[in-house]
Amino acid sequence: MDIPMDIRALSQTYERDGYIGGVPILSPESVAQHRASMEAAEEQIGSLHYKSKAHTILTSPLQLATDPTVLDIVESMIGPDILLYNVTYIIKEANAPSHVSWHQDLTYWGLSHDDQVSMWLALTVADDVSGCMRMLPGSHKHGRYDHEMTEDEFNVLLQGQTARGIDEDK
C-alpha cells in the first residue's frame, strides 16, 4: 500500500503531542489477512493475549513490525536506529466491558529513555463505539506520572497499572 506521508509533519506532530495517530498503514485486505493469521494461531496454540515476543514465533507480527510504512513512521519519531524489542497482542474485543486504563507506555513497559516508542496497530475497527485508543496530547511534556497497581478485573493491562493524577481536560 503506497501511502503518501509527510515525514517531517509526522515528526513535528510527535514532538508536539507525544504520539502520532490516524495514519493509514495497511490496506483493509492486509488487515483482514493479519487478523485471520492471528485467529488461526490462536486456534492452534491458544490465546495470544499478552504473549510477549509474538514476532519470534509467528510471521504475521514480524511482518507488521517491519512493514516499510511502520518503519518510516517510527524513524520519524526516533531516528533510523530501530531495534524491535517486543510485539504483543493486546486483545480487547468491541463492546466488551474491558478497558485500558490511563497509563504511560514507558512506565508500563519499564523503559527508561524516551527514545523508545510503542506502536498500537488495530486489526479491528476502532472507534468511539468499539473502544478506540485515547491519548492526551502533550502529556509527555509533564514528565512521568506515578502509576499504581489496581485489581480492576476489566482492565486489559496485564499489571493493572493506572496513572495517577490524569486530567483529561488538559
Functional labels for PLM-detected ranges:
Residues 128-170:
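Double-stranded beta-helix
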Residues 80, 106, 123-132, 140:
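Active-site region of the double-stranded beta-helix
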Residues 29, 94, 124-126, 138:
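Generic structural motif
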Residues 1-111, 147-148:
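Non-heme Fe(II)-dependent double-stranded beta-helix
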Residues 103, 110-128:
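Short, conserved beta-strand element in jelly-roll/cupin
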Residues 36, 99, 121-123, 150, ...:
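A generic membrane alpha-helix/interface feature
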Residues 91, 121-122, 135:
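Hydrophobic side chains in beta-strands
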